[in-house]
Amino acid sequence: MYSSKQHVNILTALLVAHGIRHAVVCPGSRNSPIVHNLNECPEIQCYPVTDERSAGFYALGMIQKLRQPVVVCVTSGTALLNLAPAVAEAYYQQMPLVVVSADRPLEWIDQLDGQTLPQPDALGRFVRKAVTLPEPHNDDLRWYCNRLVNEALITRHGPVHINVPITEPLFDYTVSELPAERKITWTPADISPTTLNHVTRMFLQSKRPLLISGQPMNPLFDEAVLMIGDDERYVPDFVLYIGGSIVSKRLKRFLRKAKETWVVNATGEVTDTFMNLTHVVQGDGEAVADHIRYMLVTEPHPFVQLWDDLLLRVRQMSEAYKPAYSQMAVVKYFESRVGDEAIVHYANSTAIRLANSFAKHPVFCNRGVNGIEGSLSTAAGCSVVSDKEVYCVIGDLSFFYDQNALWNQNLQGNLRILLLNNGRGGIFNMLPGLEQSPARDAFVAAEHHTSAEGICRQNDIVYLRADGPQDLQQAVDTLLYIDSNRPVLLEVFTDVADDERVYRDYLSVFR
């Protein structure tokens, strides 16, 4: 029988899954659920050592002989600190020492409770990875716990620290078997032909494979997922994910239905966006994608064709939609006029979501953390090292937040700004339930009545404006084609209620 502590059982199951076969265990009550589990596992041989400092080196000696990861398990408090010499030695020898420390609950740290000190990151830079496991009480926390243990155990070339806070009761051993836990596997850098062929074979042999590029051109995935609805024919069983973060929350929720995901990235980081990651391949995602595309030419896959047909229908419907005057109409017209080779920066929030639907060329956007600050400065920085026009499509809050980007003597006439001003953060009108809060407009969406005209005047920026459909096309064309040695800004004023209504109407086309 195993401990009743879910995170201890998740940890134990994954230690076994990742091939841990030896554990040095030290005495204590707080770590007793972990020690009990390790002793119960027929796959793991336990070796008791009383002195923690000595125990760390016992484990190190085993690693040197076995060339395998070995666990050293200690109780809470200074017991962990006694491992520091062995951990430092393992770090410089690049030995896979797995430190598992029991801990007191977070709320009791620094409260003069016994054997209690801040244990997360206590081993500092001498470990390659340090994680602290939550005590799960829902599916999200169980997934998080699984992910953290996997992240630690696939870390290479040095020691790792897994810290396990455990609440009382400690001595309840009523679980008959360990959970079946998802194991994440890691493949090293420099994708070999063998690895490339293996990934491609996994893709082509799956019944419903889907290749997802994090930031593709004109993906229309939001619209496609709306069209799919509850049609299970489109749900993939295997997702190959490359590239950066995905804009569409709806797509991310949809892909969490898949059975498994493989991620290809340059760093080998565990990015479990869809909560079903099973394999991390460190390497060039574009090389993998290009190889799969090449193979699909000679071996067309019916599921890929099903999705291609769907996306073609979605694109045709999107192109046929005629939005009333709104921010959507502005961006759609702008994208119909700007060249395919244009350098276009989109700010976050509503702007990038409109680009997701209507941009047919590569776009730039700060989608690392997705903040509203710095979008204009990023476009400005691009413009000073480019001999082409650089466009920035930006909402009012992002613009006013970053207006100092225009306070720079290096700016030239190749910087063109399309400012979408509806007097607030319009995306907050799209969040269901927020309309019930009287604080939404003034405090959440930052409602305002500000114009960029004065900012342009003080920074010698050519200022244009459009207030309605009668002005729009001429104003956008002027922004695109005017000859100027100074930056040009077009401020388009829309009504936030119209923007919301048009956006919802557009999405309804695909339901």
Feature roles, as predicted:
Residues V8-V16, C26-R30, I34-N39, D308-D387:
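Active-site diphosphate/adenylate-binding microenvironment
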Residues I10-I20, M62-R67, E151-R156, T195-P209, ...:
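Glycine-rich phosphate/diphosphate-binding loops that line cofactor/substrate pockets in enzymes
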Residues Q205, P209-W262, V270-T273, K360-S386, ...:
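Glycine-rich, anion-gripping cofactor-binding loops and their flanking helix/strand elements
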Residues H22, K65-V74, L80-N82, A90-L97, ...:
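Structural signature of the thiamine diphosphate
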Residues Y2-C73, A79-N82, A88:
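N-terminal cofactor/phosphate-binding cores enriched in small/glycine residues
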Residues L38-Y47, Q64-V70, A355-V369, E435-P438:
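Glycine/charged-rich beta-loop-alpha catalytic/anionic-binding loops adjacent to active sites
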Residues M1-S3, L255-T350, I455, A466-R511:
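Phosphate/pyrophosphate-binding active-site segments
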Residues V100, E107-P120, S357-R511:
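Thiamine diphosphate
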